[in-house]
């Protein structure tokens, strides 16, 4: 199993709207992609910003490519991301899941 980690930040005032937007875009598309085994959306408020981490679980790199395309280490963005995100990584990280009790 592989965990894909994507991160970005919004203004705290946009945090709830961005979360709902994530559910309608990236999270929905993750869940509709064959080989996806779940998604965690994490949020942490720091001063006037909210940091988001999206952790998605996949059965293989090929499954991730089904979502992200052949250049699967690049972050996937949606049309209104620029409206919300004040900081974001252009690349994501992938980790092999060695153990999970969830």
What are these regions (language model features)?
Residues 40-49, 77-102:
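Glycine-rich beta-strand-turn "strand-cap" elements at beta-sheet edges
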Residues 10-12, 60, 96-99:
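Non-catalytic surface loops within mature trypsin-like serine protease
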